Design a protein with these regions (language model features):
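Structured, charged N-terminal subsegments at the starts of enzyme catalytic cores
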Residues: 1-14
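Terminal regions of secretory-pathway proteins
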Residues: 13-14, 19-368
Length: 368
């Protein structure tokens, strides 16, 4: 994605330079960076979020965050028709900090620990025909290993692979094993499952039940109420020595049964949806300064007219067959050739919710 949006930045620079030939390189660069950042924010708001939380009410809400309830066609054609962010969306409205300077809160960091989405194994496939190139452990794609991997595999094939391979489920016992034994470039070895839990404790994040109380959600009275999986509830009771108030927030959220269609827990969603709006509403470049004077008319059109599929196809047109008919680039792409079924990589299930690794946060090296 860094490579993809670097290419997108350069394409925006070319557009701006073509219209404003007298501008300095620095002004072109900084303006393109603004436009690129706003496009990423739009993509994250109305595409990525609605893909991981495919719920009609949420999809309406996230679209309203960006375009307002008046809808995308009205906003794109006529611009803001109201000062109300509910009607015309947050971008271009008046900035508001709601009583506190903006920051990504510690609670937001807690709910954004999405490591179980990363699979341990990936079947790398070719964008031209869907043929299998090789099966790799994800650690072969991480850190310094990524350089040698992309020496062998073209980025377009990696893009196609990520479009047709499914992520892991946000559930217990599904934390990537390679992240539980992660060797950093300096030789230090980390158990990221343990780090995730310890960071929350160090930062004073309330334990799971208290976290829910502070969100005005119903706390659980028994371990069995948290999850219908009796094996999980028994393990939770054992690890936390029968004290439900000691459950760590990450462990609790991975234990919950998510609402229908949600990729993560309802508890995590409550924080997520608050910050999804606040990170836009508190940023002057998405509010007071979200206008043609700052972004240029060409920049505003670029943001309005493009989405993730457009970005991908601009720089990797070979992906067109895989994306044909796909309305959201973060949803599964077409497998090539169309209709062909590919055997899964070892240990990987087609149904996201069925994939399990052998260990997870409950089994990590952290005492309650």
């Amino acid at each position: 994605l860094h490579t993809l949006f670097t290419l997108e930045h350069n394409a925006i620079c070319d557009r701006i330079r073509g219209v404003y030939s007298s501008w300095s390189d620095e002004r072109v660069y900084q303006t393109a960076k603004l436009i690129n950042s706003a496009l990423m924010a739009k993509i994250h708001t109305v595409e990525w979020t609605t893909a991981i939380l495919p719920n009609k009410v949420l999809q309406t809400g996230m679209s309203a965050n960006w375009w307002g309830l008046a809808g995308q066609p009205v906003r794109t054609t006529w611009g803001r028709i109201s000062k109300s962010e509910a009607i015309s969306g947050i971008p271009g409205s008046e900035r508001h900090h709601h009583g506190a300077p903006f920051a990504l809160t510690e609670e937001f960091v807690t709910v954004y620990r999405l490591h179980p989405l990363i699979p341990d194994e990936v079947r790398v496939q070719a964008a031209r025909d869907g043929s299998v190139i090789k099966d790799v452990d994800f650690k072969q794609l991480a850190l310094r290993n990524a350089v040698s991997f992309f020496d062998e595999v073209p980025i377009v094939d990696a893009m196609y692979t990520m479009g047709v391979e499914h992520p892991g489920a946000m559930v217990l016992h599904n934390y990537p094993n390679f992240l539980r034994n992660l060797t950093l470039p300096d030789g230090e070895i980390l158990d990221m499952a343990a780090v995730d839990i310890l960071k929350d404790r160090e930062r004073g994040i309330p334990r799971y039940n208290q976290f829910r109380r502070l969100l005005h959600m119903r706390p659980f009275k028994t371990f069995e109420q948290i999850t219908p999986n009796r094996s999980w509830s028994a393990k939770l009771k054992e690890v936390y020595e029968g004290d439900i108030e000691r459950i760590d927030p990450l462990v609790g959220m991975l234990s919950e049964t998510p609402p229908a269609g949600f990729g993560f827990s309802d508890t995590a969603f409550r924080i997520f949806i608050l910050m999804a709006s606040r990170r836009i509403k508190s940023d002057r470049f998405f509010t007071d300064d979200y206008n043609p004077r700052v972004y240029t008319p060409e920049g505003m059109r670029w943001i309005a007219e493009n989405d993730m599929s457009a970005v991908l196809l601009r720089h990797y047109p070979e992906l067109a067959p895989a994306l044909r008919g796909v309305t959201n680039a973060f949803a599964p792409w077409n497998r090539l050739p169309i209709g062909r079924k590919v055997a899964r990589a070892p240990g990987h299930r087609e149904v996201l919710a069925e994939r399990r690794s052998t260990a997870g946060p409950v089994d990590s090296q952290v005492a309650p």
